[in-house]
Amino acid sequence: MSRQVTLDELELMASNCREAVWAEAQSQGREPKIYLHWTAGGYYSIFNDYHINITGDGAIYITSEDLSEVKNHTWRRNTGSIGIALCCCVGGGSTNLGSCPPTAEQIEAVAQVIDRVATALWLTIDKKHVMTHGEASNNEDGDNNCHNPYAWWNDSYGDGDTRGDLEYLGTSESPRYNPHATDGSRGGDVLRGKANFYKNQRQA
């Protein structure tokens, strides 16, 4: 199932499952996480692997009425986490974003979704709690207990089964693939920055 929701509805849903999400995460010895993905599909193809899908026009869809449900979105990191996906990037990779790159509407929508979900779960919007799949696959939150790195740029398993979702966005702020950038141009840095902007605007 999928259902379109507003930001206010989503925040209430996340608030209602806060205790359950925290309990799940703490059972794994960690705090809750929010993981950001692309679906590698078209702009309007919704996938049940993610709690939240954002279509090309920036609309927000949930695939479960219970955001504490464990979904299959981030290998060995699913328990006590929320999976959010942009419906885009079919055929995308490190050299290009495919025929459906992230839209401006999706980028702004996901930033607002991050703000609302993190607020409801009492999470700071930082890399310890909010990560792209690429960052998570590279253990950039410092948690090395889940798996070895399997990022596009750090395939420690050597099997080619790697991830780099949203490592770059194809925008002026995040124009190209550069996982070693320190200038704030990586996709995760841009999205967290935008989410904190929206958070600060709401609290002003």
Q: What label would you give each PLM region?
A:
Residues 1-28, 92-204:
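Basic/polar, cationic surfaces and motifs that engage anionic cell-wall
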Residues 76-87:
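Short coil-to-beta-strand
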Residues 64-69, 82-83, 115-118:
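Short C-terminal domain-edge/linker segments immediately following a structured domain
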Residues 33, 81-83, 129-131:
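Structural preference for beta-strand elements that scaffold enzyme active sites
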Residues 47, 79, 105, 109:
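Short, well-structured alpha-helical interface segments that form or flank functional binding sites
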Residues 40, 66, 88-90, 134-136:
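A mature extracytoplasmic/lumenal domain signature
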Residues 1-78, 157, 173-175:
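N-terminal catalytic cores of peptidoglycan-degrading enzymes
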